[in-house]
């Protein structure tokens, strides 16, 4: 396992009843009298560990290989390395990141079917053998650059019901798969298994069933050609937050019977997956500050109703946008919802509003239309479930810097992390079994404890 110490990055250890949202409020309070109200994240590493415990319970036969592309923050990768996950890397840089944390090459799959030759050679020189392919050209490249590679054939799936489709770009058909297996045999390249990806944000769990069935067909083809395949990679597509129509356990309740049917536990086949957003989406909350505001009045409609004819629309400009953290709107089809850092008054009027990023691009719009009470420059908005495909793809367009990330973890989760590193996972440990132990959050975190921040009632967004 990789090492994990809170000294590697600034991770605040939290007291019982002191949550990530309390730290978020505390950070806001710290800059309340300053003009430097930069956007920032609070990321709960304990949430990542809880997701892992949930995974072990829901998919006991499937070893997760975290998709580094989803969120390559060093703290995230360190946490997952420490608890023993594998890693799905798509480039030399991602392999360097993971191996730099002490992860052995056998816990890495180079899961990019279309690789640059120099990066194939890098994988070879650093002991990374598992890698995917879906074409004859890729086979020939690997045969020359990494003849000892252990190849995994990526097959296409029906991803028509996924939010982000992948099978248009990647994956071999069943017909092509046989030809590729025969060609691999001719080239004396070892094919050890099959992989697929049903698309990011899968909305139909039955897609997994068909994909597992297709994988079984390809395994049988491999046997006929002369390969002894022993690895099935079921890819990603698992939800990472609770605001999705399809819940994680709804998917796993369909996957497990399919695996038992087509790849029973005594078949000798190792099963892995490539979850990304599942592990990190809900761990990150983004706080943005309103830097500008504009009021737009609707045109007169001729109505006698003054409220209708003069209703105002409010435009808010905040200090992060689609060129930064909210690139997920453009590239990941995300629909984000602004929450209020301060609780509105019960009788407060709400207005039609829109939220815009800070750049000079007219496309930099975060929310086209929402209903919010009137807010002011200097007020804060919060966006939950912002850990997936946000920080990893953020740019500094127009000179706007990426938000800082403040990492937190409860004392009990920290203790569990250390126990896992020393002795492995405790028997029968489950997500709901993890409580919290009292200690001084100020002592552990090095921050002043604000009474208001430690009151759970103050967190209403």
From Swiss-Prot:
So which domain of life are we looking at? Eukaryota
Q: Which residues carry this modification: N6-(pyridoxal phosphate)lysine?
A: 69
The UniProt record gives the binding positions of substrate as 331-332, 361
Q: Which reaction does it catalyse?
A: L-ornithine + H(+) = putrescine + CO2
- What residues does pyridoxal 5'-phosphate bind to? 200, 237, 274-277, 389
| One CC-aspect GO term | cytoplasm
What SUPFAM superfamilies does the entry give?
A: Alanine racemase C-terminal domain-like, PLP-binding barrel
Instruction: Identify the metabolic or biological route this protein is part of.
Output: Amine and polyamine biosynthesis; putrescine biosynthesis via L-ornithine pathway; putrescine from L-ornithine: step 1/1
InterPro entries cross-referenced by the UniProt entry: Ala_racemase/Decarboxylase_C, De-COase2_C, De-COase2_CS, De-COase2_N, De-COase2_pyr-phos_BS, Orn/DAP/Arg_de-COase, Orn_de-COase, PLP-binding_barrel
Query: Which GO molecular function annotations are given, in alphabetical order?
Result: ornithine decarboxylase activity; protein homodimerization activity
Q: Which residues form the active site?
A: 360 (proton donor)
Protein's UniProt keywords contain Phosphoprotein: yes
Purpose of the protein: Catalyzes the first and rate-limiting step of polyamine biosynthesis that converts ornithine into putrescine, which is the precursor for the polyamines, spermidine and spermine. Polyamines are essential for cell proliferation and are implicated in cellular processes, ranging from DNA replication to apoptosis.
According to UniProt, the name of this protein is: Ornithine decarboxylase
Q: Record the organism.
A: Rattus norvegicus (Rat)
Q: Give the source lineage, highest ranks first.
A: Eukaryota, Metazoa, Chordata, Craniata, Vertebrata
